[in-house]
Curated annotation (Swiss-Prot):
One of its GO terms (molecular function) is zinc ion binding. Residues 151-160 have a biased composition (Basic residues). This is Protein lethal(2)k10201. It comes from Drosophila melanogaster (Fruit fly). A zinc finger (C2H2-type) spans 74-97, 113-138. Vital for development. Residues 146-168 are annotated as: Disordered.
Amino acid sequence: MDSEAAGVALLSREQIIRILSEVPAGFIKPTDPPAPSLAPFKKLGVLVDIDDILGEQDAAAARIRDNIDKEQSYSCVECRKMLPTAHLLDLHITEQHDCYFAASVERGDKPMFSCFLEECTIKFHTARQRKDHCIITHKLPANYRFDHSKNRGKQKHQGKSKPNSMEVDEVIEETKSLPYVKAFSFGHQTQRSFYTGKDQRSGKTLDDVQAMKEAINDILD
């Protein structure tokens, strides 16, 4: 027993006073809060303002919305044109790729051009009337490009190529109107560099020689 008591370290006076000070005095009431067993939590690290966190969340949400808008853009299957809304895509398909719509516009019996805004139900006989309506009534910009036709570039290209084709036709007509000149040469006819007439016929060699002699005699006379 004495050896076990000697091995145990004795508490100092300050330690005993500290332990006794932590013991509550008197009776403990049921309403008294229990003594905390753990130390209060202390946040260690970099402090971030709540406004910065909200700003980053808003920026991330905006990027997500932009990506969704790009993925959900409306594309025409025929010409691959991108349009921002389903209504504009419907108008594009109807006006550019629908034969019934083109025939109805040529007849002109009823208005066929719908307004660019989906909420507006007014229709017009021509695209010009619709554009004026959207600029005046709905305050759309004057350089709104939705109603441009897809064949205008082709028409311009064809218009530019027409003068060239006419010039080629004129050159062909001029060459046809030129008189036929028969090619002949003095001496042995071994080589010919150019032949402007028709195909040579093998049965008229003597006639060509006789014509050449007559031409020489005319020159000497």
